[in-house]
Amino acid sequence: MPNWTFLSNHGQVLLCIAHDPGVRLREIGEQVGITERAAHRIVGELVDAGYLERERMGRRNHSAFTTRRGLPDPLARESSIGDLLNVLVARP
């Protein structure tokens, strides 16, 4: 296996949250292979950029995507975050 991945850490964090909107930062870090602090930073960047919204529900946070927001990649500007998630996340 190569030591690289097709998805950046930001993309992998998005996938973790798409699979479980209530996932904890510690769990994101474990799944992506980054520290909890790095997961916290990435989630904050996604919120600041308008791709993700966080809502406090009791003692936990719940995340929701802004699915119409365009991708930041110059080669994929015509696509939205929703388009990306539709391709990468299997829906039952």
Residue ranges and their predicted role:
Residues 56-62:
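Short, Lys/Arg-rich nucleic-acid/phosphate-binding segment
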Residues 37:
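Key DNA-contact positions within bacterial/archaeal DNA-binding proteins
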Residues 30, 47-48:
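Alpha-helical residues within the helix-turn-helix
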Residues 43-44:
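Short, hydrophobic-biased segments on the C-terminal half of alpha helices
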